[in-house]
Amino acid sequence: MIRVYFVKDMGEHLMSLALRSIKISRYLGLSQETYINKVLERFRMKNCSPSVSPIVKGDRFNLDQCPKNDLKREQMKNIPYASAVGSLMYAQVCTRPDIAFAVGMLGRYQSNLGKDHWKVAKKVMRYLQGTKDYKLMYRRTNNLEVVGYSDSDFASCVDSRKSTFGYIFILAGGAISWRSIKQTMTATSTMEAEFISCFEATSHGVWLYI
């Protein structure tokens, strides 16, 4: 390639699109600590106290938490909720599958957010404050086998009674693809919700294989 095109050697690749690669012995790590610090600073959460979890069992989101009149909607207009969710989503898509469920829930209320939704968004940022040094780690191996897992709850959406499912695929000891999203159809049983989750995960696994 060097003989055909002009190529400039910039040395070993360490940083790209807010992703930092770290080599440790037989492992390669991907980190977004620098990006997370910028997000925390942007939303004035740089010195916030850390949270142990982005969301806890029993947390519920529904349309009743949204503003019911124009006055309350006007009060929420100055809150940078959509920007915060978008920033969290970029971290989630790149290196943080552990916040996929929470960010997915927050994204459902961008058009009419309530104070409770903003509190949870800040809670996710507090969680990132305490875990910003987390990395996706991949080990050198001759066995490049993709392993996938899927799961689903049942009728967790209070408004639509639809279930939320998720899947994750592992390669070389680290996550390479993941998703958490509300199902498009209403499952009538836990078994049906799990079957839908398994189908979606299998379809994505076939795509990864191809």
PLM features: what roles do these ranges have?
Residues 1-210:
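Long, low-complexity, charge-biased intrinsically disordered regions
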